[in-house]
Amino acid sequence: MKRRTLLKAMSSLGVIPALSYPALSRGIVDGGHEGPLLLQIHAEGGWDVTSYCDPKVNQPGERPITTWSETLDPVRVGGVEFAPFANNEWFVEKYHQQMLVINGVDLQTNSHTTGILHNWSGRNAAGYPALTALFAAHYAPTAPMAYVNFGGFGSTENLISYTKLQGDPAGIAEIVEPNLQGRVIDNPVYEDGHPVYFRQPAELSLIEAHRQARLQRLQARGQLAPREAANLQAFSEATRARGPLKDFADYLPKAEAIFPQDEITHNNLKAQVQVASSAFAAGVACAADVQMGGFDTHDDHDALHKPLVQLLNESIDLIWTLAETAGYADRLTVVVGSDFSRTPEYNSQQGKDHWPIGSVMVMQKAPSWGSRVVGLTDERQNAIAIDPVSLQADPSSGAIIYPKDVHEQLRQLLGLADSPLAARFPFNSGSGFRFFGDLS
């Protein structure tokens, strides 16, 4: 979809304010990625799943686990149950058919560092890549920005390089098109303004020709040291990516369309989503990590958690709105998770501390496995062993869900299970879980 059409649709949906739209529109960049896409959202700090996708109500004789359950019951829509907290009811009603909730995931730690590592690599020791890195290396190893990371866990284990970004489309545009000095409104053909360059395109073409000739001479020299040869090859690949990246600048939202930092939570998650969506729409990226902080609520838990959950849900809604509008929703998988969860009771500061049993949410457009919850926890949020095939409680001979089990199933879902790259990082859990049903 062309950028002009995309922005008009966004405005009509109320996603962004009304804008002036550039006439210089184009489709996906030449040779852009048109295959599967993966976006992961990290709720940094440890989210409280008892007020989200694994709702818990207070039990007689026990300390309160949630304050909302003093007057309300969990909200069930289809096969999914959420807490009636923040804007959860709106969110689950709109998206339950697109989601699978995996509860009772044992992160085996109360450490932020280990929890992040475990949740996003599938292992609680260093040495395994982020799922997004593996995905990008498998599906789009030569894309200019195949793997985009806005923070959080981003280990690549040398499978691929990542592009580190912030949620600042204006700044990114300056980087990907550094020769653009500005625009002058002097021609009705250019609604965005006539481009003014530091150097004219003809001059840059001449400089580029000389650069390529010199690079070829260097690469043709005999007896290059391995590091020197690798550096020259990396430079050659980087220069080839400049053309698509220049085109990518046309997909980025204009300054007045960029979501500002959230005033309550001080997160710019929506702006991160806008940049990631632009990269997906342009075909220059196939995997992205976005993150929001603030979930480490050791005091005043409910008051601090509520706006965070609301922003998270709104941002997921924005992801799917942009994906539908740009026409790539049927290629997108979204995974949402956190370091771990929070304790099944409040502390003396009305906060909640760290708890290892958490959840993961997976979303696609119209999946066969949607509107379901797998994994079990008891009334005090302890993990319950389940039968890997029936997914029913089996305390005597069942298995607890660990991040490695989630990653094994995600690899199956995403077509990575038989990848030679994935074979370098096996889990071999032997648990045989089938969260998504028969994927053969």
Place the predicted regions along the sequence by residue.
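Ligand-binding pockets and gating/stacking loops
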Residues: 2-440
